[in-house]
């Protein structure tokens, strides 16, 4: 890696770490951690399938599109994680403790955030009245991943950006 790129990366990592530590410390209250843990768990695959299942029944076209979106996102972010191999903050730093078990080894990008934003964009385009709830949930989930010690802010920002793009693309095929 060229020296100028390495220097920029090092500055970015330092900023990421400062923000991750600040958010992690700010939420050092057991009740808040428990609430954010519940929010984070709501972004797990079984919950997404529990949402997509009824969609397949209510509106098969939207349900199938949501399934395809989820599959496409997996195909995007798994190789990125394998390529970047970024350690999770709770693994790399002793002062950041994981308040939940990470779903995989690497942190970049945040798959939970990617899926939450992608589905929020898609479902908001389908049912605009749900947009505040869906976008609010996606933002809360993204914050929870940093607070709980399993992601850096840049992980969730990258996940959100990818999810926004894939969700917007998928929304073009809504009936």
PLM-predicted stretches and their roles:
Residues 35-38, 53-54, 67, 135-139, ...:
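Residue-level signature of the transmembrane alpha-helical core
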Residues 68-73, 77, 159, 163, ...:
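Alpha-helical transmembrane segments in multi-pass membrane proteins
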Residues 1-47, 77-103:
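N-terminal transmembrane-helix/juxtamembrane module of multi-pass inner/ER membrane proteins
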